[in-house]
């Protein structure tokens, strides 16, 4: 019995490599996507986003087709275009895609900097609602009530060795720098106006002094 089981296992294991599907050509994969209604070649131009679940599913199916195709540079570019289009579609459907993407962006590029592109007011409202529902506070994986519990217990907020007031000081310094730059621009504009005013006055005085005297009548 054991020998029969071992032989059957060997036969199945030997047949698995033969059952593996060969990769399809990339042009055939693009044509299959076009049959689904996904025109990859038009993604470089200004095309409308169809914010429907069917469009999102078609983009997902097209992406799976491209994954099974020959992995060339053209395939990877097409996969990137389809993936970006699907993310835009899911964002338009109300999912907080840009909020999730912003978590991995460098410092200084927050969610607002990402979402204030071509989003409508409805899209921004949906993003704010999903941000409250899906990720209410903090980073991904962070305990949102940790700071509140520490504050209630009278414990120092933040992790050991963390500068608690660093963000507040950075905001204050940025606000002070912005106010100073605004004041400096206003002062410079006033200084230029004053310079032009006094230059006009200095130019008018010599002209009045250089007025020729009236000639005396000859006797």
Curated annotation (Swiss-Prot):
Tissues expressing the protein: Component of the acid-insoluble and acid-soluble organic matrix of calcified layers of the shell (at protein level).
Keyword Signal in record: yes
Domain of life, per lineage: Eukaryota
Signal peptide as annotated in the record: 1-15
Cellular location(s): Secreted
Positions of region (Disordered): 138-174
Glycosites: 118
Name of protein: Uncharacterized shell protein 5
């Amino acid at each position: 019995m054991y020998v029969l089981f071992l032989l059957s296992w060997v036969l199945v294991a030997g047949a698995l490599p033969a059952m593996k599907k060969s990769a399809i050509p990339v042009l055939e994969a693009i044509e299959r996507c076009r049959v689904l209604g996904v025109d990859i070649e038009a993604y470089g131009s200004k095309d409308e986003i169809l914010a429907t679940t069917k469009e999102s599913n078609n983009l997902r199916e097209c992406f799976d087709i491209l994954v099974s195709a020959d992995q060339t540079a053209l395939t990877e570019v097409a996969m990137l275009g389809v993936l970006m289009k699907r993310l835009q579609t899911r964002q338009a459907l109300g999912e907080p895609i840009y909020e999730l993407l912003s978590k991995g962006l460098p410092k200084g590029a927050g969610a607002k900097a990402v979402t204030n592109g071509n989003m409508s007011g409805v899209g921004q409202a949906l993003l704010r609602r999903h941000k409250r529902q899906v990720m209410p506070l903090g980073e991904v994986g962070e305990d949102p009530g940790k700071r509140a519990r520490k504050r209630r217990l009278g414990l120092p907020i933040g992790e050991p060795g963390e500068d608690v007031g660093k963000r507040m000081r950075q905001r204050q310094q940025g606000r002070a720098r912005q106010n100073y730059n605004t004041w400096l621009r206003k002062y410079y504009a006033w200084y230029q106006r004053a310079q032009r005013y006094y230059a006009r006055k200095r130019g008018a005085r010599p002209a009045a002094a250089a007025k020729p005297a009236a000639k005396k009548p000859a006797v």
